[in-house]
């Protein structure tokens, strides 16, 4: 089965083998060596000199770590939302006492400097601005996160970014962008199994975290910082998943991080070229189309279940439907991890055949040619 869903993604045989070993003591020198390797390599992907931690939790747990460590009583938290994961960020900050401003962005737009500036002007002082870099549920990506962060810092607000699907698929560049607390996960563009979260914590975030009198017992980042000084975790980690993550990061860096990003860009170019040939309508507005996951409205007379089931049963390709209140309104195709020309082309071919069988007349041959051409143009052999 070919996984073209927005996570979990397929993993390399090396990553699978890395998990097939006997357990070790998480207070041993062997584990400390493993932890050091993960952190040092993860910093290269985050492009940060800040502290990086691995939490035994999902990406959502990483977001909760940010909310629980940064939110002071009465803090005003602005969350520009364009989908479900923005809503979940808002829920997390609200659960920890934040006064959350849920700013729904309209017309298929994601967070962008103009929108964030307008919201800050409208709502006055805020302490934290939090948003997903890439909104997986609607296929919408943020624009110019660096400028968003500059505007927020100018107003005295910290910037928290959910980069769970973005890291490894696009250049996040935490330090250059000015992200204070960045959360990611391994099961998307890093091509590792789910079950841990990666977080980077910058100086501005630490200043606030260390002032906080009550921190969560499990997600206490100060505690994690103290343990990281000796390359350990405060609590028993998912050692097997640490091995997998370590191997996945090594694969990316051996392949070449720039090349890894270019391959994702080529996959996006090929995928969108094919999808546009089919005249599908995207949830994202022009300029906000996610290169990581494409979300399309369902063509008239079809259902997402019919499209997905035909893709799975007839072609062995798994794609996604909508989540929560988007269920039944869209279908989604991801471009993450071990993406290749063959996977993109096969997906475009299969989708075209399925659309034709369900009553939408499309030119499969032209779509495949355009997908191949755009992939090759962006990632020459």
Per-segment meaning from a language model:
Residues 281-314:
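Conserved PLP-binding catalytic core of the aspartate aminotransferase-like
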Residues 49-78, 82, 86-91:
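Conserved beta-loop-alpha segment that forms the PLP phosphate-binding cup at the N-terminus of a helix
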Residues 1-56, 60:
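A glycine-/small-polar-enriched, mobile loop at the entrance of the PLP active site in fold-type I
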Residues 175-187:
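Conserved active-site segment immediately N-terminal to the catalytic lysine
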């Amino acid at each position: 089965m070919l996984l073209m869903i927005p996570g979990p993604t397929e993993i390399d045989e090396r990553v699978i083998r890395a998990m097939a070993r006997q357990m070790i003591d998480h207070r041993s020198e062997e584990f400390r060596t493993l932890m050091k390797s993960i952190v040092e390599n993860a910093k290269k992907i985050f492009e940060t000199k800040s502290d990086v931690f691995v939490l035994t939790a999902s990406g959502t747990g990483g977001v909760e770590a940010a909310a629980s460590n940064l939110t002071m009583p009465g803090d005003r938290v602005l969350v520009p939302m364009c989908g479900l994961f923005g809503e979940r960020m808002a829920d997390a900050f609200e659960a920890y006492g934040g006064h959350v401003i849920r700013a729904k962005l309209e017309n298929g737009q994601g967070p962008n400097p103009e929108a964030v500036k307008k919201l800050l002007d409208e709502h006055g002082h805020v302490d934290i601005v939090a948003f997903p870099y890439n909104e997986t549920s609607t296929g919408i990506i943020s624009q110019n996160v660096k400028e968003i962060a500059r505007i927020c810092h100018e107003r005295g607000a910290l910037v928290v970014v959910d980069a769970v699907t973005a890291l490894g698929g696009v250049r996040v560049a935490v330090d250059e962008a000015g992200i204070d607390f960045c959360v990611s996960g391994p099961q998307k563009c890093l091509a590792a199994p789910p079950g841990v979260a990666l977080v980077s914590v910058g100086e501005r975030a630490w200043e606030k975290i260390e002032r906080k009198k009550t921190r969560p017992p499990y997600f206490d980042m100060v505690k994690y910082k103290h343990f990281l000084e000796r390359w350990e975790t405060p609590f028993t980690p998912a050692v097997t998943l640490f091995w997998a993550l370590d191997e996945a990061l090594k694969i990316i860096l051996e392949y070449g991080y720039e090349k890894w990003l270019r391959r994702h860009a080529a996959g996006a170019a090929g995928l969108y070229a094919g999808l546009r040939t089919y005249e599908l309508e995207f949830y994202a507005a022009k300029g906000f189309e996610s290169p990581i996951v494409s979300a399309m409205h369902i063509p008239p007379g079809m259902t997402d279940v019919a499209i997905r089931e035909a893709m799975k049963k007839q072609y062995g390709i798994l794609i996604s439907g909508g989540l929560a209140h988007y269920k039944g309104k869209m279908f989604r195709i991801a471009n993450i991890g071990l993406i290749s020309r063959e996977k993109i082309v096969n997906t475009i071919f299969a989708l075209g055949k399925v659309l034709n069988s369900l009553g939408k007349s499309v030119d499969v041959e032209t779509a495949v040619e355009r997908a191949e051409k755009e992939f090759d143009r962006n990632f020459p052999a």
